[in-house]
UniProtKB/Swiss-Prot annotation:
Component of the Mediator complex, which is composed of MED1, MED4, MED6, MED7, MED8, MED9, MED10, MED11, MED12, MED13, MED13L, MED14, MED15, MED16, MED17, MED18, MED19, MED20, MED21, MED22, MED23, MED24, MED25, MED26, MED27, MED29, MED30, MED31, CCNC, CDK8 and CDC2L6/CDK11. The MED12, MED13, CCNC and CDK8 subunits form a distinct module termed the CDK8 module. Mediator containing the CDK8 module is less active than Mediator lacking this module in supporting transcriptional activation. The keyword Amino-acid biosynthesis does not apply. There is a cross-link at residue 185 (Glycyl lysine isopeptide (Lys-Gly) (interchain with G-Cter in SUMO2)). This is Mediator of RNA polymerase II transcription subunit 7. Residues 203-213 have a biased composition (Basic and acidic residues). The gene is MED7. It is found in: Nucleus. The modification Phosphoserine is found at residue 194. One of its GO terms (molecular function) is transcription coregulator activity. Residues 185-213 are annotated as: Disordered. It comes from Bos taurus. SUPFAM superfamilies: Mediator hinge subcomplex-like (SSF140718). It comes from the Eukaryota. Keywords: Activator, Isopeptide bond, Nucleus, Phosphoprotein, Transcription, Transcription regulation, Ubl conjugation. Disulfide bonds: none annotated.
Amino acid sequence: MGEPQQVSALPPPPMQYIKEYTDENIQEGLAPKPPPPIKDSYMMFGNQFQCDDLIIRPLESQGIERLHPMQFDHKKELRKLNMSILINFLDLLDILIRSPGSIKREEKLEDLKLLFVHVHHLINEYRPHQARETLRVMMEVQKRQRLETAERFQKHLERVIEMIQNCLASLPDDLPHSEAGMRVKTEPMDTDDSNNCIGQNEQQRENSGHRRDQIIEKDAALCVLIDEMNERP
């Protein structure tokens, strides 16, 4: 017997839409555009909703009787509703045992339905708070990750600086050129108020030739240093 085929609990992805969103189609602008936003009303779970409706609609607007006052403690009311559901469920079991065909059975079912609606409504009123809390936790995680990244970068930077300092300390003292010759000289820019272009060009050529000589001297010193390092056992 072959292995049993695993069936996914979710429906398969819509391949007729996925194949249209290739990289080539997106780059060429051939991918289908998203549907326009809904402006009036829409259907969801068999019910019609308006776009300007509140996310959490009041119970009265849905034709449902309110069992708790306008000002209340959510935790306290949820505990009371939970206890009421348990008591009504036990009453329903007692009715089913004593008189299954009694009309009280339907009344008790309606009471349980109303209690569950209130429980879900109070839980949904916590959704904005849950969204804010989720966003806060996400931002804290991002902050911690960035701080850890910055700390790792600082450690690597300190390690690189230490390696460079060790390399500089291990350089031999008998270099062909002095340390001052190895440094990059920074001099203030010469300003010439004259408008003689020929003099300026000659000065630029002299400066460029001087810089080229400095670069050649530094390259020679570096080559000598590398040769000495290779000759060491």
